[in-house]
């Protein structure tokens, strides 16, 4: 009887440890995906914005796409971000952008259900400012 009780208690402890590890791994995988996607989307968005600023400064027409308003600037980030993520759940992206200063401040919230059915949220805030193009001549 003692052996059976010990075996059952070890089984329950093992299951609890497995559940805790699964919860931690699920959170870390989602956080890692959110970090990588947000930083890559920010870099891609800022490259396009830098091209726009250089077009204005050097009076050229070399940028991939024109960004004319703050809403377009934020929408470009959202599009770049949504292409990069592939986990389930919902993403809400809000923020502030300024086309003339090259400023982009974004708050990303990722809401998902973990393996136990609980609602979880991960939130990340990113701020980026483009350096001003200067004439060295």
Where are these regions (language model features)?
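Short amphipathic secondary-structure patches
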Residues: 25, 29, 44-116, 130-136
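Beta-sandwich strand segments
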Residues: 116-122
